[in-house]
Swiss-Prot record:
Keywords from the named record: Endoplasmic reticulum, Golgi apparatus, Membrane, Signal-anchor, Transmembrane, Transmembrane helix
Gene3D superfamilies with a match to the protein in the record: Spore Coat Polysaccharide Biosynthesis Protein SpsA, Chain A
Membrane topology term: Single-pass type II membrane protein
Segments crossing the lipid bilayer: 18-33
Protein name, as recorded: Mannan polymerase complexes subunit MNN9
Subunit composition and interactions: The M-Pol I complex contains MNN9 and VAN1. The M-Pol II complex is composed of ANP1, MNN9, MNN10, MNN11 and HOC1.
CC per GO annotation: cis-Golgi network; endoplasmic reticulum; endoplasmic reticulum membrane; Golgi cis cisterna; mannan polymerase complex
Chain's gene name: MNN9
Entry keyword Manganese: no
A GO biological process held by the record: protein N-linked glycosylation
């Protein structure tokens, strides 16, 4: 059959005369005017259903790299395009969300009541032992959010790379193994990792170092705390061993602020056997000597605990550990460290933060404890409940 004959029959068929214009209009609409979704996509799905990795994993990264840069929001409606795979802007449904924080509670039965906990970690070095310990916590992961902040330095870049790899393995696993949400920040303020291990413990750099750390903690806290957060657990990146029931054990006390006792495992060369020793001396009770020293200081001076140059004679929780004692025994405190400290979210919401300036001659976590007490919150510690700090290698 010749082409001319086929063309003649098509022109004479009334259905063809109707179908071709309709098809042309439909194609023009799809290409130029269709707004909701494209007909093309991955795995047979529409492009509007396509998600970036951070959306598939329910993992939220702040835009520290182009790879994970979040789309900018615009109220202008974007026209669809046949080959456009742009992900729709991520905004709350309806643009406005209402939360009644009066219904948000922090109780002694946190897991039973499905209370959300936010675990926050400033991280200058990624330790696999820290991550492995985090994964062995048996609090429901759908109730756990993680927040990290890394410095903009070479060590911070390395820590970030290792952290991202570890996160991807978990957040692409079975849904039951994924954390509710993960946020990574790159520090905008002064970096907190300028010094090596021995240098960062020197007395003459404490004010600068602790101020930088306070800024990092505040950036991390205020960028991650959400309307569903009931508890905030400050867990240092150097903490590599805790009981699996850490969160349940600490929330059970139902305290506004509660600190675990930070110890360190090491090999005792004299006794030729493994042993433990106290590590964190920032969990303390105030003393008359400490108050007297503070009264004689200038406005910009701070007291730093654990140094012979400033003998405050404060009772340090690290020295109250009793191997035969009850793990749940409580001790009233006036200062806390940030190694493993649980805080009711309402304490932070009420304004207790980490001062990067001398606050009653205290700074960072110890200043936070003072601020919380000024807000009429009580501070406690668990002298017989041990968690372990990694043993430093760069002595």
């Amino acid at each position: 059959m010749s082409l001319s004959l086929v063309s003649y029959r098509l022109r004479k068929n009334p259905w063809v005369n109707i179908f071709l214009p309709v098809l042309a209009i439909f194609l023009i609409y799809i290409i130029f005017f269709q707004r909701d979704q494209s007909l093309l996509g991955l795995n047979g799905q529409s492009i509007s259903q396509h998600k970036w990795a951070h959306e598939k994993e329910n993992t939220f990264y702040f835009p520290f790299t182009k790879k994970y840069k979040m789309p900018k929001y615009s109220y202008k409606k974007k026209s669809g395009w046949l080959f456009n795979d742009h992900v729709e802007d991520i905004i709350p449904e309806g643009h406005i969300a209402h939360y009644d924080l009066n219904k948000l509670h922090s109780t002694s039965e946190a897991a039973v009541n499905k209370e959300h906990i936010l675990i926050l970690t400033p991280m200058q070095t990624f330790h696999q032992q820290y991550w492995d310990n985090l994964l062995q916590l048996n609090y429901p992961r759908e109730l756990i959010e993680l927040g990290f902040i890394t410095p903009r330095t070479a060590t911070g870049d390395l820590a970030l790379k290792k952290l991202e790899n570890a996160i991807k393995k978990v957040q692409t696993d079975k849904k039951t193994q994924r954390f509710s949400k993960i946020t990574i920040l790159r520090q905008n303020s002064q970096s907190f990792d300028k010094l090596m291990e021995k240098e960062r413990h020197a007395l003459d750099v404490q004010k600068e170092r602790r101020a930088a750390m306070a800024l990092a903690r505040n950036e991390l806290l205020f960028s991650t705390i959400g309307p569903h957060t009931s508890w905030v657990l400050w867990l240092d990146a150097d903490i590599i061993e805790t009981p699996p029931s850490l969160i349940q054990d600490m929330t059970k006390h139902n305290k506004a602020i509660l600190a675990a006792n930070i110890y360190q495992r090491f090999y005792d060369e004299e006794k030729k056997q493994p042993s433990i020793r106290p590590y964190d001396f920032n969990n303390w009770q105030e003393s008359d000597t400490g108050l007297e020293i503070a009264s004689q200081m200038g406005d910009d001076e701070i007291i730093v605990e654990g140094y012979a140059e400033i003998a405050t004679y404060r009772p340090l929780m690290a020295h109250f550990y009793d191997a035969n004692g009850v793990p749940g025994e409580e001790m009233a405190l006036d200062g806390v460290g940030g190694g493993c400290t649980l805080v009711k979210a309402e304490v932070h919401r009420d304004g207790a933060m980490f001062p990067n300036f001398p606050f009653y001659h205290l700074i960072e976590t110890e200043g936070f404890a003072k601020m919380a007490k000024r807000l009429n919150y009580d501070v406690f510690g668990l002298p017989n409940y041990l968690v372990y700090h990694i043993e430093e290698e760069n002595h």
